[in-house]
Amino acid sequence: MNAKGELPMSETLLDRLETAVVDDREHGVFRCRRDIFTDPAFFDLEMTHIFESNWVYLAHESQIPERNDYFTTWIGRKPVVITRDKAGELHAIINACAHRGAMLCRRKHGNKGTFTCPFHGWTFGNTGKLLKVKDGKTADYPTTFDTEGSHDLTRIAHFESYRGFLFGCLNPEAEPLSAYLGETKRIIDQIAHQAPNGIEVVRGNSSYIYDGNWKLQIENGADGYHVSSVHWNYSATMGRRNYEADGVPTVDANGWSRSVGGVYGFENGHMMLWTRLLNPEVRPIYAHREELARRLGEEHAAPIVEQTRNLCLYPNVYLMDQFSTQIRVIRPISVDKTEVTIYCFAPKGESAAERALRIRQYEDFFNVSGMGTPDDLEEFRACQAAYAGNSQLWNDLSRGATRWIDGPDENARALGLKPTLSGERSEDEGLFVRQHEHWVRVLRAALLKDGSGGGQPASSVKQIRSVA
């Protein structure tokens, strides 16, 4: 650092990670550096060590319901296909031909017992086994060709389900999924317990790309502070809707900021925003509160019916149970481009009337045509554009700092949760500090293990101004 408080261009990635997040309670400073959203060097590290070395969400079992069904997705930069074989077993396989690497399945989903590569005609079973090589008998392959599965498709190192939610990991040395999810399993249980037979993904989805870093969406899904300003149009429209003339009833968005709520930070970067509903009777689940109480007990049923929850399972999915019910999957494409795919989920066996209400509520806020999603995407774009200017180094994350609690608050204890941090209001920002600290730990450990010391210089700025 020079006399002007500037960090030179020769500053390494490891140097920058040391100062990427400030969690200084003594001086009341809580912030993160904006270049963590803009630097391609950080993005490359994220893809390798966060997305391609840890557990990520893949799909829900209900999206591959029948024998020979398949569903395509991604783990970081790696294309993946999930298949259900003729015996009903699920498999997760790298979606790349073992011959020359062309993507094998090029549709989002379908039903096939075998896959033939369009490039050179190799055929594989949906378990990944190589079945046939085009013109193989006259090709003069060496004797070692296709022995002991050498040319089968590559299986994902770890592939597990929790309550029907499917996760995969490319790292053979990763901890078990149950340990990675940790305390968040209790919230996933709340979602899965909404019907005796669990939940299912409703047919159809929306997919869109925004011009911004993936962490903008990860933050925003648990940001209660932005709701009243960014989504004022949604709140105003719902306030003017004529419910007596068959308008779709909605969760009270006008009362969001004044409702009881809070935030939680968990191990491994997971986090959650919750609120207590002011009008829980408008949601389809409310009609089942007595059945839930009988099946689960009142202490477990009450929060399912009376609370909203936006649960971030780091690094790539939100399970949202609020204005409606949604699975939001985040896929980074580049440092400043992100794909989001959203699905509506619902309890299995719910009535046609309840399903219709759920979907109408979903359409009001979500989808690219909804009143919420486009507003968020504009803010992501605006943030990314301004970050590139480097006129200010820091994002302030100190809202609610005097109320943050290490460990569980009263609501968390009632739920049996043990977060590492609790915020007493839904607008508190401490959970972002914890999540970005996890980001730093993962990348720093990777650089130190690599032995390079993060010697790559900063790539996105010539000089970085240190702002006290």
Regions found by a protein language model. Give the residues of each.
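Generic structural signal for secondary-structure transition and capping sites
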Residues: F51-W55, A102, H226
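Rieske [2Fe-2S] iron-sulfur-binding domain
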Residues: M1, Q63-R186
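N-terminal low-complexity, Ser/Thr- and acidic-residue-enriched intrinsically disordered segments
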Residues: N2-E11, L17, R33, N68
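Non-catalytic accessory segments flanking enzyme active sites
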Residues: R25, F30-V81
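Short, contiguous pre-domain boundary segments
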Residues: L14-R34, G198
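Short Pro/Gly-enriched beta-strand edge/turn motifs at strand-loop
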Residues: E52-P65, T138-T143, T308-Y314
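C-terminal catalytic domain of Rieske-type non-heme iron oxygenases
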Residues: E89, A157-A468
